[in-house]
Amino acid sequence: MTAPRRIATFDHDGLVFDVRDTGPLDGDVVVLLHGFPQTGASWADTAALLHQRGYRTIVPDQRGYSPRARPRGRFAYRSSRLVADTVALIDTLGTGPVHLVGHDWGAVAAWSTAARRPDLVTSLTTVSVPHPGAFLRAMLGSDQLVRSYYMFLFQLPWLPELAIRSRPRVLERTLAGTGMTPAQIDQVRQDIVRGGALTGGLNWYRAMVFNHPAALRARVTVPTTHVWSDGDTALSRRSAELAGQYVDAAYRLEILSGVSHWVPEEAATTLAAIIDRTATDAASRPV
């Protein structure tokens, strides 16, 4: 472990990732992983509240989103590379194990990182998206398959990008239907559509077919909280209910009432408190 120092970027796989490193430098580290179609900016409100609780937050713009970390081809976005990115970030920090948090696709990366490298994760908080195995089981046994229709559309090459760029009103109505505010939608237009991150973000979906089946069975052995909101149009309650079956450690399911999919912005105060409780409980457990 090295003395804490601020970082603005980290390197991995020949790529350069942008990082927001804020909060008390000597605080316990919370790594916040964003999802689609957003950047690390989506964590701003939650991060500020965690700073008030004494945490240092590390928020990367992930693979496909950072301007210098946009490899071509969907194979470069398979789960093993996303985990390796997160491991490289934690190694760059040099502060030892972290409290790992992920929302949406960031939750997928967080689940897989905690399963593969529990030595680097003190606690895990996942938001919206459950363990990959729970998600698949929900697809086969609930309305999750219908909710996930867009994932199949995103498998098409270049057509989703063309549709999103050529029909901005359709994008606006679609995102508004998920609970996004006008300000959030404008941010998506600026950061993702105009900012050149659209294909990279979609490639996370397109790489799903390359992910190793073992990820569906991987066990998580660190204290974990999964957060699901009942206003989420993309993820079913059943998917959340199944998540705990993949955790061999202290586990809690938190259900937020009247909150949409966009929990880090819409319910930042509640989420920061949940992250703090998960981290505090994990830190107090005997090794």
Placement of each model-derived feature along the sequence:
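Conserved HGGG/HGGXW glycine-rich cap/lid loop of the alpha/beta-hydrolase fold
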Residues: 20-69
